[in-house]
Design a protein with these regions (language model features):
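Solvent-exposed loop and beta-edge segments used for protein-protein assembly and interaction
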Residues: 16, 65-69, 78-80, 87-91, ...
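Core alpha-helical transmembrane segments of integral membrane proteins
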Residues: 163-200
Length: 200
């Protein structure tokens, strides 16, 4: 269903993490707050799968890749209130996040008159049930990418913490493997160079 993601108890059980990639309402060139949606004054939206495009142009050569845009997604959660976590990867290059009507956080300043970029990851925990509207206003004038290019991760606090810990562990293993490969390459290069010097 367009604009709504249904999350059942089964979807949120155990260590399950839901990646919020699909069904986003996307409003390029607009900075809509929850009040605008409540008043039904929004126009010009389209549906978007995050990661399909790297900037606000949506692949069109006639549209600007930088600028501002609003993202909107509705979550349909179980009726029993629970504490959830929303993990936001890098959003380029400044944004404000609303949950329902509440302004929850900002990274940098997406306001066009006071734009300031600040890129970083963010984890938000909140208690909710039923319908939750996620509204994100993003602005970019300083990076090759624009807006939300990586889907947020959603789940219970425990599930998100385990997901982030696993990511960190894998990143650490990868860096260690790269370092070990580089050290071995340097060792064999020096060994080969030394042997060649002895031959000649």
């Amino acid at each position: 269903m367009g604009g709504v993601m249904f999350c059942s108890d089964a979807d949120l059980s155990g260590d399950s993490v839901i990646f919020l990639a699909h069904q986003w309402n996307f409003f390029p060139g607009k900075q809509y707050t929850p009040s605008d949606f409540n008043e039904k004054s929004v126009t010009g939206g389209t549906f978007l799968t995050l990661g399909s495009f790297g900037n606000f142009s949506l692949g069109s050569t006639s549209e600007a890749s930088n600028g501002t845009a609003t993202y909107r997604l509705t979550l349909s959660l179980p009726d029993t209130a629970r504490t959830y976590s929303l993990y936001l990867p890098e959003i380029f290059s400044a944004y404000t996040l609303y949950l329902n009507e509440e302004k929850v956080c900002s990274q940098g300043n997406p306001d066009l008159a006071h734009y300031k970029d600040l890129i970083g990851n963010k984890e938000i925990s909140f208690t909710a049930s039923g319908t939750v509207h996620i509204t994100i206003i993003a602005t970019n004038y300083s990076h090759i990418y624009s807006g939300i290019t990586y889907p947020p991760a959603f789940g219970t606090v425990t599930a998100i913490q385990k997901y982030l810990s696993t990511r960190l562990f894998i990143s650490g293993i990868t860096l260690a493997a790269i370092f070990l490969f580089g050290a071995c390459s340097l060792f064999f290069f020096c060994r080969l160079k030394h042997n060649n010097a002895l031959v000649f």
